[in-house]
């Protein structure tokens, strides 16, 4: 059987497609992004703004007589892979990557109104052991757990990451409200990195002003455990239910605490304010130009130099 895989988003490696590829190749099928004369087509999109494009592709391949499967969070939050595909070693050669990706847990203990996880995955639970998706010779792992520190096996999994000296990126973010002396001590021994495996990085979020005190306590606890503030990055949701003033307050507080902020506009919002704010923060322009000066347009030469770099 010839199996064509289509990643509509093409923003980052699609884990579901890698598992589908592995399953079909195990059966002896030809599977990939450039398969001619397909008998079956899998189309996946994570983002809702690509839904129309994905549905258009599905209709096209159906008109050619192909069997078509379409899925992903952008299409159907409840659709999941069959267990025999979900729990297979992903085909990392599909994207030519040399790091592993996976979930040790699914779901979350929170119920944030902007997040699809509660609707998609429900309450937190164990999902898979690290060895199910980890390739030891690479020693690099990106964990997609939505709330790793709340998972039933967080302690065992941290101990395993430490013992095996795995370079890991918690790029979905850890919950700063759950930081305590015990997990901070273990995290200090983990080989944690950003998702490029270049800089030492632990990711958190500061989406709610109400968690300010817990956040400050968490930062202090991590620092006391030996984790430098420069290793901490906080995602900051903007454009959901906050004012401009509240957004700036949270960002300025993070800068004052000497940790790294990273702006995340809600649902990819493109109001003129949000792209400017994201550029000012995410490209570290704030280290050179105050916000008031930046938004007034009086720092365009500096901005152009940064964009060239």
Language model features by range: what are they?
Residues 13-14, 69, 77-80, 125, ...:
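Charged phosphate-binding loop/patch that engages nucleotide di/tri-phosphates or the phosphate backbone
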Residues 20, 53-61, 157-158, 183-187, ...:
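A general structural detector for well-ordered alpha-helical segments in enzyme core domains, enriched
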Residues 25-30, 60-70, 84, 162-169, ...:
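Structural alpha-beta junctions
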Residues 12-13, 50-52, 76-80, 110-111, ...:
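Short catalytic/ligand-binding loop motif for oxyanion handling, primarily in non-cytosolic enzymes
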Residues 5-9, 42-46, 116-218, 229-240, ...:
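Core AdoMet radical
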Residues 196-201, 210-309:
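A structural motif corresponding to the C-terminal lobe/cap of the Radical SAM core domain
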Residues 1, 67-105, 109-140:
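N-terminal [4Fe-4S]-dependent radical SAM core
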Residues 1-70, 75-77:
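A short, structured N-terminal alpha-helical element that caps or precedes a catalytic domain
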